[in-house]
């Protein structure tokens, strides 16, 4: 455990093979509102010679601690946590600051090859992966991103996709802004955590995957992220797949992380 922002405590699993040479590292980010996968599941990368760090998002389903203290409601999830206060006090702003702290810790690990630090994440983990790469361009050298969450909130709203993972938007609007008088205000604040707004800052190559039948993170909102990437990138579209494990993407990311050159 390490201390994070505003009284938070960061918890992460750290696994590495027994090798004397410096190791490539995968930063693994989990989906919403879960936790890092089990030690057994995380061993797949270790068996291939990678070290792995999997951080639990504070205040979600794992051991990371979040002290709360957000202004306003937390009515239905973390998207709206802090939405009534200043943007820097929103839950996801704090989370991305905590990821910055994690990356500072990574830079101190002598056993890690600092030229081969990769990120991997799906859904909320994909959003964190984009933000991590964007905010730490000198550290992250490759990113594998599958159906990223928290992207293009306005489009989510217009598509009436504010259910399941995005349901906080619907409850917040109905209970605290039923006349729509503050809609522009809270969409502006959500812009601070919109994955699409981080994408143009990413400098490393990105492997990107989208399930075309995804009803949780609609493909159109994922396009908003991919289209803003100005780095080397490659997108795979999986017809018939929703918001679920996509084994073909798993195989693609292994090749992406293992090969010497990341160019597509």
Task: Name what the model sees in each region.
Residues 78-123:
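Gly/Ser-rich "nucleophile elbow"/oxyanion-hole loop immediately N-terminal to the catalytic nucleophile
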Residues 12, 22-32, 52:
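Short beta-strand element of the alpha/beta-hydrolase
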Residues 202, 208-210, 214:
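Short beta-strand/loop motif that positions the catalytic acidic residue
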Residues 130-180, 245:
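Hydrolase active-site cap/lid region
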Residues 37, 43-44, 51-97:
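Cap/lid segment of the alpha/beta-hydrolase catalytic domain
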Residues 235-254:
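Histidine-bearing beta->alpha loop at or near hydrolase active sites
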Residues 1-20:
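N-terminal cap/lid segment of alpha/beta-hydrolase-fold proteins
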Residues 212-217, 244:
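Acidic catalytic loop of the alpha/beta-hydrolase fold
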């Amino acid at each position: 455990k390490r201390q994070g922002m505003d009284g938070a405590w960061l918890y992460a699993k750290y696994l590495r093979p027994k090798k004397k040479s410096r190791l490539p590292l995968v930063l693994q980010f989990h989906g919403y509102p879960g936790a890092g996968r089990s030690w057994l599941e995380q061993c797949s990368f270790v068996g291939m010679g990678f070290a792995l760090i999997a951080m639990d998002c504070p205040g979600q389903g794992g051991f990371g601690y979040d002290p709360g203290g957000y202004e306003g409601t937390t009515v239905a999830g973390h998207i709206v946590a802090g939405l009534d206060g200043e943007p820097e006090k929103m839950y996801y702003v704090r989370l991305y600051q905590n990821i910055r702290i994690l990356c500072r810790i990574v830079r101190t690990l002598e056993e890690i090859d600092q030229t081969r630090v990769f990120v991997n994440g799906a859904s909320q983990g994909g959003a964190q992966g984009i933000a991590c790469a964007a905010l730490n361009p000198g550290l992250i050298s490759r990113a594998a991103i599958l159906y990223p969450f928290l992207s293009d909130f306005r489009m989510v709203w217009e598509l009436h996709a504010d259910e399941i993972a995005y349901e906080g938007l619907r409850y917040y609007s109905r209970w605290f802004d039923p006349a729509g008088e503050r809609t522009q205000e809270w969409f502006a604040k959500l812009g601070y955590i919109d994955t699409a707004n981080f994408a143009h800052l990413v400098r490393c190559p990105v492997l990107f995957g989208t399930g075309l039948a995804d009803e949780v993170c609609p493909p159109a909102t994922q396009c908003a992220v991919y289209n803003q990437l100005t780095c080397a990138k490659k997108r795979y579209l999986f017809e018939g797949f929703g918001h679920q494990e996509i084994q073909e993407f798993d195989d693609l990311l292994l090749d992406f992380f293992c090969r010497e050159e990341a160019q597509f």
